[in-house]
């Protein structure tokens, strides 16, 4: 009898443990109700007609041949921006690894305003046999009011493509490669392996600076099939600090005035080696403590991520590493700054409506593969602790239902139905093939750290290998219980894709955010938002008097239900997807004729902190951020109502209003 009681107790205990470990699952009716709020139409991205043959793997250094599919797993990237100056972020700049081309084109469905064209660096030197583009940034790098582009590569340093001042748009002229002048960011012909980049005013002088994140060590020959020797990989699986450097560039006034020119000064030794040489895959910049100096989040492969507190002054860069605190119930790897996961994507957003930015980070969370955990670093609000070196964040991904999905790269937070609550999405997938190589990768994960740096000891990851090559990109929506649920299946977003970057923008000005996924070794797609019955919204194009996007400007507002919303003009946060430099708030059931009080904070182009409170009716507004001191509006309490549009421009589904002090 006792024998049977013991067996029964073991069965009951196992059943209880199983029930406790299962994730809550909504009913089919509840899932259908969540999915009914959203609808997206998929369109392939345009290509140039002479793009050449597709390839499915890169030529690599001979010592890396056995892992050529692994080395070839990055490169797809996309940026959404207003490149042609029509007032809408309806232009694409994307990288297709199948052709190694950087293509600029109108977003599908936004009229054929110009023919797609390739952004090649000629006449600058670029060896196509050993170089590959990895991503792009859009920004006004010479502060002339025109949108420029930056392309970063494996095998060379980044290139600036500066827009010429021309009669484009006034007499039938169209945007083309001839409108851009290629310029070196760095002279000297060094070999960099850049995986990500971000722009922000790092030192608070009022000008936007650049941070380039490299993956493989600087000077390597990763894509040179004729090189000798043996390339070095990560020095360990959980604390690899031998990767490429993070390079910081401070903006400088250009010396040339009669042609497009930009000048940046590289500042050395800004970071310690522990920060500077992680194997970086994603970076983000956002003001997290309210001083309008951007903190930096650096997401690293094979090692801990880094959150850096910005303590800089104009011309003097200074950052301090922040680390989280651990209690009895928190695993070490779920403490900020102590994780050993594979950070691959990062985004900022206020997930709980408390008026503070939280941090969403992608890692690897593959069932039957490598189940780490994604991070949702929820702000505790104790921002004063940053001065003590403490990161005031706790990991809430498991509680919120955002800890698991797949082999994830880009992480994104955005409000796609304008209800005032952010949705979450990720780009997933690693290597697509027919032979499951997870057992071999798991064996590598349990091997001695002393051999991981040598590619001879790695498993066979050549073409044909499969590592999470059939993942679907998740689309998480918050349920009534406060948890997030993946509704990709009922939405029809179930085609497996090996995705890397996600770019978000309202490409047609209708108030509904659209997105583009950049896919590795496959076609990339626009997902046009056709969601029914969306709420009201407030959209802000915040610009300086010269027309440059006010990167780093912060907007805040409150909703009747008590939620506080905050967002910033983003300068490229993420892995390889770049959202447009706009601010978008979903307002829910707000009356569309009722003004919204919004508070804007920014640094002007002299580096002085400015605040301005104004009222705007829902819709898109372009707000020129002038020096409010000269207008006698020096505090947020001095409210100013902005009355209707000084001028308006018709756009598909909406009106773009321009408002000025």
What are these regions (language model features)?
Residues 91-96, 146-153, 210-214, 291-300, ...:
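Hydrophobic beta-strand segments that make up the repeating blades of beta-propeller
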Residues 75-85, 105, 132-147, 161, ...:
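Beta-propeller blade termini
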Residues 29-34, 100-120, 157-180, 222-236, ...:
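Beta-propeller blade repeat segments, especially FG-GAP/WD-type strand-to-loop junctions
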Residues 214-241, 362-369, 428-467:
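Short, conserved, GDST-rich strand-edge loop motifs in beta-rich repeat architectures
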Residues 48-77, 123-137, 185-198, 242, ...:
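Repeat-based blade/solenoid architectures
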Residues 191-211, 339-435, 497-499, 503-535, ...:
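Repeat-solenoid scaffold signature
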Residues 2-49, 53-69, 73-77, 468-473, ...:
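Gly/Ser/Thr/Pro-enriched helix-cap/hinge segments flanking short amphipathic alpha-helices
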